[in-house]
């Protein structure tokens, strides 16, 4: 077994077999989502997010941090390829907030070809991300551990939607064109540095739970969801509490010499927002 697989399996607490089949893909997808949190802290610190072969693995796997789509799906793609899966990355345009104009390609997702079928896998779309692969088939409702999704085909494009309280909400649109490393670097740079990028204006964190729930942080506001409904919400009183919740609830590593961060560094990040613990939303 290669070093990255050893490290990755230890990170997600995987001890089973890893055959190249749909059962393995489903199990790894869910394990990843439930162990490695989505988070954008490096954008805010700020630290440059590197996408070379080693950097995402060092950060998300070795240092036990989280990351966003370019890192999350970059690591997952490499793991799947090491296992023998036929996988490649795609780039999508995020339309979740109904933008007035077509946005740039800033979301990385995965296309897996397996057993004469094509599947979409995505461990990096935050709180609404897939937690299981879905078939690349149009207008088919597909159930995952955390909700229902469907794909719609519009010409050469595909649109991923999720069922939000009986209303279908579009998340992003993509095509199947092959992308280059420079395309991911460009999308990553734009996401981290464009002044209006939402990653620059809020602390965002999410970890899914095996029972179908999820935990989220938006600035100082912590929420625990079950079956799509909030069962616990609280505003954390101070940065020390936020720092503790990141470690205890999201499993975030903070001690790594390169990728860790101190409570004082976190305090500087949170002071930059036009919000305070009592009103964190």
From Swiss-Prot:
The modification N6-acetyllysine is found at residues 214, 281. Keywords: Acetylation, Acyltransferase, Cytoplasm, Transferase. Changing residue 281 to R: Markedly decreases acetylation level. Decreases O- and N-acetyltransferase activities. Optimum pH is 7.4. Changing residue 127 to A: No change in activity. Its main location: cytoplasm. Acetylated on Lys-214 and Lys-281. Deacetylated by CobB. GO terms for cellular component: cytoplasm. Inhibited by salicylic acid, acetylsalicylic acid, 2,6-dichrolo-4-nitrophenol, N-ethylmaleimide and iodoacetamide. It is an enzyme of class 2 (transferase). SUPFAM superfamilies: Cysteine proteinases. It is found in: Cytoplasm. Changing residue 127 to F: Significant decrease in activity. It comes from the Bacteria. Signal peptide: none annotated. It catalyses: an arylamine + acetyl-CoA = an N-acetylarylamine + CoA; an N-hydroxyarylamine + acetyl-CoA = an N-acetoxyarylamine + CoA. The active site is at 69 (acyl-thioester intermediate), 107, 122. Disruption phenotype: Deletion mutants show marked resistance to nitro compound mutagenicity. Catalyzes the acetyl-CoA-dependent N-acetylation of aromatic amines, and, probably, the O-acetylation of N-hydroxyarylamines. In vitro, catalyzes the N-acetylation of various arylamines such as aminobenzoic acid, aminophenol, aminotoluene, phenetidine, anisidine, aniline, isoniazid and 2-amino-fluorene. N-hydroxyarylamine O-acetyltransferase activity has not been assayed directly, however, NhoA activity is required for the mutagenicity of nitroaromatic compounds, suggesting that it also has O-acetyltransferase activity. PANTHER family: ARYLAMINE N-ACETYLTRANSFERASE 4-RELATED, N-HYDROXYARYLAMINE O-ACETYLTRANSFERASE. This is Arylamine N-acetyltransferase. It comes from Escherichia coli (strain K12).
């Amino acid at each position: 077994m290669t070093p990255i697989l050893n490290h990755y399996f230890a990170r997600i607490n995987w001890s089973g077999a890893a055959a190249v089949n749909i059962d393995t893909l489903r199990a790894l997808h869910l394990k990843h989502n439930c162990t490695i949190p989505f988070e954008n802290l490096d954008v805010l610190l700020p630290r440059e997010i590197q996408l070379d072969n080693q950097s995402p693995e060092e950060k998300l796997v070795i240092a036990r941090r989280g990351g966003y789509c370019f890192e999350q799906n970059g690591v997952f793609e490499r793991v799947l390829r090491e296992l023998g899966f036929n996988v490649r990355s795609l780039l999508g345009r995020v339309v979740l907030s109904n933008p007035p104009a077509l946005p740039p390609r800033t979301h990385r997702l995965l296309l897996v070809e397996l057993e004469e079928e094509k599947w979409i896998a995505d461990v990096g779309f935050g709180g609404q991300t897939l937690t299981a692969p879905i078939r690349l088939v149009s207008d088919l409702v597909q159930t995952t551990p955390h909700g229902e999704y469907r794909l719609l085909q519009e010409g050469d494009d595909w649109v991923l939607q999720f069922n939000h309280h009986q209303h279908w909400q579009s998340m992003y649109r993509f095509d199947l064109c092959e992308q280059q490393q420079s395309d991911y670097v460009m999308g990553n740079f734009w996401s981290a540095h464009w002044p209006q990028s939402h990653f620059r204006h809020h602390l965002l964190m999410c970890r899914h739970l095996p029972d179908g729930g999820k935990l989220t942080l938006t600035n100082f506001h912590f929420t625990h969801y079950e079956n799509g409904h909030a069962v616990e919400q609280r505003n954390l009183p101070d940065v020390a509490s936020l720092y503790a919740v990141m470690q205890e609830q999201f499993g975030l590593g903070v001690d790594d010499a390169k990728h860790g961060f101190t409570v004082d560094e976190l305090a500087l990040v949170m002071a930059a927002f036009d919000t305070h613990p009592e009103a964190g939303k």
